């Protein structure tokens, strides 16, 4: 049995994914997320009665560190990086950080009880890597290790990205995944029939984690992962470019995306809070794209833009 140190932060729901990434990048071995919205969404799934739960606007994210980690220094670094999120227009709310030691707690195994297989779209189900799961006819399985980094793939921004990929992929496409994180969108693209997938992330941790997740899923030799800063220096053309990152970063890839997307190809963007949606749409349309689909889940937005001269199938066309 090992000793672990626990750091719990409470922040506004809109920064859940960014805050989780900050904790992972600070050396956490994994995170768990306590969100009342998830409880309420799933509470009546089996027709059972549950205690009343009030949905609040904050989430609690708990990160776990080895006993040897300098938790005081980590706490300071995490707090500083959370403060920086306001530079991207994100409101963290009143940040609350609490630390404690878990005595003789083998968290490396115990935390797994929080994660179960989740059907995300009509075809795609995300399954924790340690779980035996028998797929139904037509069901496509994505094996992930949520303890590595970047959550479980069930965040609204990821869900909408997966829905969009199902919408546009028909088989044989080349896909570029910008800011790949866990690699979930690349794995999904392969399962949905893409021929070649190129996944980029600026963070070396993400590149490693993505590759490890990809290796867990058979038949993913068509996914190529590399360190990259958005689309800078990329010359490979693509039928689809997908990016699930912050809105203030998305706007800086729209011109390069238009250069790389083939005629009649698509740009999928997610991770956009509602107040930033108009800005992202303006930048994409300025680059030359036409809006085909706009999705909203809570305060999050996702979109599918098309590189086309045919306005009949686009919004406003």
Swiss-Prot record:
The lineage of its organism: Bacteria, Bacillati, Bacillota, Bacilli, Lactobacillales. It comes from the Bacteria. Pfam families: PrmA (PF06325). Belongs to the methyltransferase superfamily. PrmA family. This is Ribosomal protein L11 methyltransferase. InterPro entries: Ribosomal_L11_MeTrfase_PrmA (IPR050078), Ribosomal_PrmA_MeTrfase (IPR004498), SAM-dependent_MTases_sf (IPR029063). It catalyses: L-lysyl-[protein] + 3 S-adenosyl-L-methionine = N(6),N(6),N(6)-trimethyl-L-lysyl-[protein] + 3 S-adenosyl-L-homocysteine + 3 H(+). CDD domains: AdoMet_MTases (cd02440). Coiled coil: none annotated. Its main location: cytoplasm. GO terms for molecular function: protein-lysine N-methyltransferase activity. The gene is prmA. Keywords: Cytoplasm, Methyltransferase, S-adenosyl-L-methionine, Transferase. Its EC number is 2.1.1.-.
